[in-house]
Design a protein with these regions (language model features):
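Beta1-alpha1 glycine-rich phosphate/pyrophosphate-binding loop at the start
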Residues: 1-81, 182-183, 252-258
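Short hydrophobic core segments
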Residues: 17, 87, 107-120, 155-158, ...
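Short beta-strand to alpha-helix junction loop
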Residues: 51-70, 82, 233-242, 267-279
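A conserved short coil-to-beta-strand element within the FAD-binding core of flavoproteins
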Residues: 82-98, 147, 287-307
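Glycine/threonine-rich phosphate-binding loop and adjacent beta-strand/alpha-helix elements that clamp
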Residues: 320-391
Length: 393
């Protein structure tokens, strides 16, 4: 967003308020083992800052974080950022036609307020009775405790979403036993990941147009999925093929029919985001893994309890319970013309014009706003489109 504004007006008076100590957002914070992107590297980069050095078809957390830091530095973003500064409140002042912004480091005023807090900024922890009594170690995957050695530990993992599908295969060989709590099974497809040869990276550096063509080809391929997912004439043929492929993977990688049945979703494929992994099923079929088809209902001093009342002794609880993309915490702190917060106006059902602007909140723009996420391609494309719209407004 800021890079777009500065390209249009290099002298623009722009200040970024960032509660973290560095740029990078989710790729700065999520450092769990195996953290990587499920979108091809060819698309997971800005069009104005192509990266020829990706070492894998799907970038790792370390690669993406380094890329974002470099882009921020080169685009003049870092020097316009106030780090370690958390938003407390933002109120529209109609008399002055300005936003009055209160932060942990003082008050600011602005003609325009852009909420670019993202959808994956605040981890969600389930409200489970007894957690306060648990004597072991517990943490959310987005706040991974690297000081806690999992070697020989009995671990409970809560959740089987996009984070767990990456970190569980990375820790399963280290732990003594892993108990996986799965509330809802997900459709899983192979991840077309592979190394990118140094000769290819060199080719991209020497001939950027080739990389641009590859990017366009990958984008077009991803867009074809939309046709198969949304157009009635295509859904009739495409969705059964998608599901057949997913069931084939499940059948080959999970030999136990009872476990395979529990890992088979009870909803049509594409109703939720499809997870991509080559090592998820092999990991959770290990002898030291138990899959519990239940939510975590309570905790004790030495373990966790499922819905049937069964207790599992564990030393460590890892929450892979995701975030609250439909209820961004920033919505509680931004107040419009009538003094009501975004959260109050939305009342549990977020909506915005083009996912960007909300009636009653003048000169407020949302990045990654309601209903702008994707289930098939790169959010980077959406963010650039939103940034261009806001810059023209």
């Amino acid at each position: 967003m800021v890079a777009t504004l500065l390209r249009d007006d290099p002298a623009a008076d722009v200040l970024i308020v960032e509660r973290g100590d560095d740029v990078g957002g989710t790729w700065r914070s999520n450092t769990y083992p195996g953290a990587a992107c499920d979108v091809p590297s060819a698309l997971y980069s800005f069009s104005f800052a192509p990266e020829s050095g990706w070492k894998r078809a799907h970038g790792t957390q370390a690669e993406i974080y380094a890329y974002l830091r470099r882009v921020a530095r080169e685009q003049g973003i870092t020097q316009r950022t106030m780090f370690g500064c958390a938003l407390r409140d933002a109120q529209w002042d109609g008399d002055r036609a300005r936003w009055v912004v209160s932060t942990s480091r003082g008050d600011l005023t602005a003609d325009v307020l852009i909420a670019a807090t993202g959808a994956l900024s605040t981890p969600t922890l389930p409200k489970v009775p007894g957690l306060e009594m648990f004597r072991g170690t517990m943490f959310h995957s987005a706040e991974w405790n690297h000081d806690h050695d999992l070697t020989g530990k009995r671990v409970a993992v809560i959740g089987t979403g996009a984070s767990a599908i990456q970190f569980v295969p990375s820790i399963v060989d280290k732990v003594e036993h892993l108990t996986l709590f799965q509330r809802t099974a997900s459709w899983v497809m192979p991840k077309r990941d592979h190394g990118i040869a140094s000769s290819v990276r060199s080719l991209y550096r020497r001939f950027p147009l080739i990389q641009k063509v590859v990017r366009g080809a990958v984008y077009s391929q991803k867009e074809m999925y939309v046709v198969g997912m949304t157009k009635p004439f295509a859904r009739k043929y495409a969705l059964p093929l998608f599901e057949k492929r997913a069931r084939s993977v499940l059948r080959k990688q999970v030999p136990d029919p009872e476990l395979r049945d529990r890992l088979t979703p009870d909803f049509a494929i594409t109703c939720k985001r499809i997870l991509l992994s080559n090592d998820w099923f092999p990991a959770i079929t290990r002898r030291n893994v138990d899959v519990v088809s239940s939510a975590l209902t309570s905790a004790t001093e030495n373990g966790v309890v499922d819905a049937a009342g069964n207790e599992y002794p564990v030393d460590t609880i890892i929450f892979g319970t995701g975030f609250t993309p439909s209820e961004p915490p920033v919505a509680q702190h931004v107040r419009g013309e009538h003094g009501r917060s975004l959260a109050e106006v939305w009342n549990g059902s977020p909506s915005a014009h083009l996912g960007i602007s909300v009636n009653g909140f003048p000169n407020l723009f949302l990045m990654y706003g309601p209903n702008t996420n994707l289930g098939h391609s790169s959010i980077v494309y959406m963010l650039e489109s939103q940034a261009a719209y806001i810059a023209d407004a």
